[in-house]
A protein has these predicted regions:
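Bacterial N-terminal signal peptides that target proteins for export
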Residues: 4-19
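Bacterial N-terminal signal peptides
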Residues: 18-28
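Predominantly soluble domains enriched in secretory-pathway, periplasmic, or organellar proteins
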Residues: 30-381
Length: 381
């Protein structure tokens, strides 16, 4: 996390862990008796929990339809649904390998082991699928392990053909900058790279362009350089990519932090066009880990961490804030936008009415989600 957010988190209350045994029992009770294929399901909530399970949750009932066992050790839990709504890809095995599953059956249909020989590759949440569903993208951070030293190598965007199935190898790779976390594919053949700045890379040529200048912006001495944070992706329902950031507007040339106006801002990328808007959206009053927009009104955003909040960015106002029972990292909306699902960190997904933010339900998982994404897979008719 960026330096500004890190300095604030110790002031916030910590995570209260859930009972794993009780969670396992409840999760088992919620699942269908034979974990049957649910061909009528059109909307799934997806997440990953320890010890290594991809959970497919029926959003009509808010019950676990099935849980797919991940090979290897628990990873980051980053995941991305395919455009067809029938498959999902998960980053596992200590942030190194990618596994693709058929959501109806839990069949493993894709795998990619990124480490090889004396080179260990880690991917930090960077996982995306092309708009046509044919390619998978990761940002690889390789390190060569020697007898007495580690050699940090050039990060790269790796491109895989999903049709290559198990034990797939990259078909192309291109050098990229460090600090890249969440990524997303555009309709025009680019991948959005969330790092110090928001950039886009052409997946055929490797050409890179700046989408939103953040760390490199030039707004003069009256503004603090933004501290951007990209961990979780929540924009598939609107085909967008959102990068939140924190900045400050100073009162004078003294650049006094105490008297400055602190703001949340965001870079918002339209994945259909690859174009972005970057602006301040509401005052900074508390830490938010993730933002998701309401499809009924794109000016309404929800945020989560120790609180669940609702914001009108047209008015640059915070409309409502409710305390959560523990820390959460990620959130999503149902397709009709009437329910907010807040997950990550612990072993529970908290369900809230999107109008009042009142808690209306909970989904218990058999283990904590840690840094796992919470994503929605919608099967088109």
């Amino acid at each position: 996390m960026g330096a500004i957010l890190m300095s604030l988190i110790p002031k916030l209350r910590g995570l209260r862990a859930a009972g794993v045994l009780a969670a396992a029992a409840l999760a088992t009770a919620c699942a269908t008796p034979a974990q049957k294929s649910a061909t009528a399901d059109t909307e799934y909530l997806l997440t990953v929990s320890r010890p290594g399970l991809l959970h497919v949750i029926d959003m009509k009932t808010d019950r676990i339809a099935r849980s797919c066992e991940l090979p290897g050790k628990f990873g980051s839990g980053a995941l991305v649904p395919a455009p067809d709504g029938r498959h999902a890809f998960v980053l596992g095995n200590l942030w190194e390998d990618v596994y693709g599953f058929e959501l109806d059956t839990c069949k493993l249909v894709f795998s990619a082991r990124q480490s090889e020989g004396d080179v260990t590759v880690k991917t930090v949440q960077s996982l995306a699928v092309s708009a046509d569903g044919s390619e998978l993208y990761t940002v690889q951070n390789p390190v060569r392990r020697g007898a007495d030293r580690f050699e940090v190598l050039q990060p790269r965007l790796a491109v895989y053909r999903i049709a290559d199935g198990l034990d797939a190898k990259p078909v192309r790779s291109f050098p990229v900058k460090r600090r890249i976390t969440k990524i997303a594919a555009t309709a025009g053949g680019e991948v959005i790279l969330g790092g110090a700045d928001v950039e886009a890379i052409d997946v055929r040529s490797g050409a890179v362009r700046t989408v939103s200048a953040l760390a490199s912006w030039d707004r003069g001495p009256g503004w603090l350089t933004p501290d951007a944070f990209a961990m979780h992706s929540q924009g598939e329902h609107l085909n967008e990519y959102v990068m939140p950031y924190v900045t400050a507007k100073f009162a004078d040339d003294k650049q006094d932090m105490a008297s400055a106006e602190w703001w949340w801002g965001m870079s918002r990328v339209d994945l259909a066009t690859g174009k972005a808007e970057t602006r301040e959206i509401f005052p900074f009053q508390f830490v938010i880990f993730s933002l998701v927009a309401d499809p009924r009104d794109r000016n309404i955003l929800y945020g989560a961490f120790n609180t669940l909040s609702k914001h009108d960015i047209a008015k640059r106002e915070t409309l409502k804030v409710v305390e959560l029972d523990h820390t959460y990292y990620s959130l999503q909306l149902s397709r009709d936008a009437t329910r907010v699902y807040v997950g990550g960190a612990g072993s529970t997904i908290s369900i809230h009415d999107s109008g009042t933010l009142e808690k209306i339900g909970m989904i218990q998982l058999p283990g904590d989600m840690s840094t796992a994404d919470v994503r929605v897979a919608w099967r088109r008719p």
